[in-house]
Amino acid sequence: VLFLITDICSVYCRFCTRKHFTGQEQAFIRNDEYEKAIAYIKSHPGIREVILSGGDPLTVGDAQLDRVLGDLRAIEHVEIIRIGSRMPVVCPMRITDDLVKILKKHKPVFLMSHFNHPNEVTAEAAAGLEKLVDNGVPVMNQMVLLNGVNNHPALVQALNRRLLFLRVKPYYMFQCDPSQGTDHLRTSIEDSMEIQRELWGHLSGLAMPNLSVDIPDGGGKTYLVPNYETAREGNTRYYKGWDGVDAKYVSPAPEKIKKPELHHYLEEWNNLKSAKTPV
């Protein structure tokens, strides 16, 4: 679930998908709203991950952040906590020793950074990122493809290689959301997929982000993947690689496919699928 704990940001991005919500001077969620959110998470055991967002969660004070993380970590079924933040980009001095201690205390806490251009990976930003990962806080990056800003494979590969060198995993490469006033910043799906297609030929899997689009009206994320399959014949599939090389892949006959022993994992899986609350 997404837990919005503030509407304040350290910088207000022109392409923000929540511009209707941010900047309303609510530095921290009202206490009654906070208690209601915590109670909701407690009462829904299907919730395994909580994403702290806003606004930027790292604009709140250390004591408040410690309280939020502590309350979430006390909920037995919450396994992973994520924090989405632009602070490592625009205000890396926020990554203090005290902050790192708080994040480490409530592990596992993942920091989801938002670097969009290789020029944003400054020496100060690099120092903040290394302080996080050196202390066991995993960092993953979510970038947005922006027309006229970073919509070229040369820029995307430079960004992701620099981040990976700093032990930051490139995670998402988002299609810019159709927010009001952002048409001039949006790339076409075709152009975005062509960027991804070129990256696959020149980046390792570790450096490769997942191209994704947020479907409007609550449809959730959908991966955008170039289709390399050219034909099928029975158990044989034909592919054309990113470099234009044609190849075929022969699958085992269906009668040779065996189901593994599932034990208690099947019950866990069925519970996950039947949970009414998305995780």
Predicted regions, residues:
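Iron-sulfur (Fe-S) cluster-binding segments and ferredoxin-like electron-carrier domains
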Residues: 18-28
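Auxiliary Fe-S-binding modules of radical SAM enzymes
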Residues: 164-279
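Conserved AdoMet/S-adenosylmethionine-binding subsite of the radical SAM
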Residues: 35-49, 58-203
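Short glycine-rich or small-residue beta-strand-to-loop segments that form or flank ligand, phosphate
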Residues: 4, 51-53
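Short, internal active-site loops enriched in acidic
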Residues: 57-58, 88, 217-222
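N-terminal pre-triad scaffold of radical SAM enzymes
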Residues: 1-17
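Non-heme iron-sulfur electron-transfer modules
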Residues: 28-34
